[in-house]
Amino acid sequence: MRIQSLLLLGALLAVGSQLPAVFGRKKGEKWGGCPADDGPCLLSVPDQCVEDSQCPLTRKCCYRACFRQCVPRVSVKPGSCPQDQLRCLSPVNHQCHKDSDCSGKKRCCHSACGRDCRDPARG
């Protein structure tokens, strides 16, 4: 009975270590996404982190102002944003900044003239 318990525990640990890969996340990568980065580039600032595991609790290692830093993560809805093949002729105008700004299943996606709420691409 003891050997069976040890084998079961070993199998559970092996499967558990593969869960991030199965669900599309790297080991140490936290749930959620990075907030939109609309700030100007600060090229002389060194990265404050390289991966999520270096950030406290609910923060993720994200690009902000062209360098990586620990920032509060945002929720991300399922699906991917559709490709936009247009070029913008007017000033950039963001109608949203994160998925939670959009109703229902819509995602906050980059478009030719800024970000707006769109239905996820089918695929």
Curated annotation (Swiss-Prot):
Secretion signal, residue range per the UniProt entry: 1-24
Residues in WAP domain copies: 27-73, 74-121
Disulfide bonds: 34-62, 41-66, 49-61, 55-70, 81-109, 88-113, 96-108, 102-117
Entry's Gene Ontology cellular component terms: extracellular space
InterPro entries per UniProt: Elafin-like_sf, WAP_dom, WAP_four-disulfide_core
Keyword Disulfide bond in record: yes
Any one GO molecular-function label of the UniProt entry: serine-type endopeptidase inhibitor activity
Localisation: Secreted
Keyword Transcription regulation included in the entry's annotation: no
Pfam families, alphabetized: WAP (PF00095)
Keyword vocabulary terms for this entry: Disulfide bond, Protease inhibitor, Repeat, Secreted, Serine protease inhibitor, Signal
BP-aspect Gene Ontology terms: antibacterial humoral response; innate immune response
SUPFAM superfamilies associated with the record: Elafin-like
Protein purpose: Putative acid-stable proteinase inhibitor.
Protein name in UniProt: WAP four-disulfide core domain protein 5
Lineage, broadest ranks: Eukaryota, Metazoa, Chordata, Craniata, Vertebrata
Gene: WFDC5
